[in-house]
Amino acid sequence: MTSEGSKFGNINSQPSCNRELQSMASALPGDEETPLVGDISGLEGRKSHHTRDVHILSLAFLLVFLAFGAAQNLQSTLNTEDDLGTTSLGILYLSFTFFSVVASLVVRVLGSKNALLIGTTGYVLYVAANLKPNWYTLVPASVYLGFCASIIWVGEGTYLTSAARSHSTDNNLHEGAVIGDFNGEFWAVYALHQFIGNLITFALLSDNQQEGSTKGTTLLFIVFLFIMTFGAILMCFLRKRGANSKGQQELSGADAGACASLKSLSKSLASALSDVKMLLIIPLIAYSGLQQAFVWAEFTKYVVTPAIGISGVGSSMAAYGAFDGICSLLAGRLTSGLTSITTIVSVGLFAQAVVLVLLLLNFSISSGFLGTVYILFLAGLLGIGDGVLMTQLNALIGILFKHDTEGAFAQLKIWQCATIAIVFFFAPLISFKAVLVIMLALLCFSFCIFLLLALKVGKAPSPSTSQRN
């Protein structure tokens, strides 16, 4: 076995070392090469650095995405000339969809940490393009961000799942529960980007009530660029992680040629689409993308802005982010396997169904304080649904597809982004009520198919590496 112990503290072989420690060291998972022999302090260090990496990853994503999330929320109300804002977002997610097809291969070649670092550059460039928004700045930035987003999200899912599996093995914990905990922490912190980013937006644009006005946006985007830079720097402190399985190690080895890699990628994508479990998850993945695009493009434009003005976008999305974060944390803590995931997803979908029905019935409260509270209430329910879906889908994929983690997370992003792109391109062509009907229909369909998955898999326990060892 190769030794990489120097990364975590040098641990020398000693003749008197306890044989049980040798056995424990050799049983550690393949995503991190480990020394054959270790002392107690070295072993304890290995047990703790996985959680440290999750803390760093979560905070870095918060800093990067609080800027991008706020900029994205403003596109449909700020860059309104020739629908530049929504069109650029449509191009972004179309690019995201196409690049997600090869994202798993890119992440395997680069490694998950390098993919995360390169991925941040696209978000910085996109926010910078908003300093002078036009077709020649936003469109190229959107295309490049599509590539960067595809690798940063596949890298994130791979990195987080690898850390969870290693942590469960090192501490002899249930793997499914650890994956749920790690995803809960990440998505809870990540969801705060909506809360913090939109509070900053509200503070800097509080005097800006007119749709299409650019007053104060230059300062806003400059502040965001500084914050994103700190997030990118923070990612440099992540520890490198390798492949999760023997097959992935072989693919990323130096002797793996380009043709072999592409062939493996094609087989991986075809295998995922022929897997009944993945086919049963795809409708729910598609709905998760649809509901995100609805919040960014439709809810802010047709519900929030007419009721409380463009400055209300910041406060309503802050409420959305707050509930998103709280529910992500709670959902992650409660996740232990498919049964708990099914229950939690049911609650999240019900919350969003309530919003869709209220909007379809055109239920509203008179303007003023109660009107504002009603908008914040709707935003909070949407945040609950998003927090549940993001946490549970990532945990579910980590549990069910442990032998091809990159490929499974690539499928997640392909289907999410395809539906998001469709919304940004076609929503302007159909009425708001038609969008609501489509969303409600897909919600019901995806939930029924997801219940079929739960029945198919049954109550089979999540594989736990720790239990096998």
Question: Predicted regions: what is each one?
Answer:
Residues S58-L62, T137-G155, Y159, I282, ...:
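Hydrophobic core of transmembrane alpha-helices in multi-pass small-molecule transporters
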Residues T121-W135, V347-G368, F424:
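C-terminal ends and interior cores of transmembrane alpha-helices
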Residues F68-Q72, N198, A270, V276-A318, ...:
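Extracytoplasmic gate region of multi-pass secondary transporters
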Residues E20, G30-H49, K246-L279:
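Juxtamembrane intracellular "pre-TM" segments in multi-pass secondary transporters
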Residues T217-F237, F350, V435-L455:
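Symmetry-related core transmembrane helices of the 12-TM Major Facilitator Superfamily/SLC fold
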Residues L89, S95-F99, L145-G157, T161, ...:
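Glycine-rich segments within core transmembrane alpha-helices of 12-TM secondary carriers
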Residues A70-L74, I151-D170, V295-F299, V303, ...:
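Intracellular juxtamembrane helix-capping segments at the cytosolic ends
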Residues F98-N114, L205-D207, D324-S346, A427-L429:
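Helix-to-loop junctions at the C-terminal end of transmembrane segments
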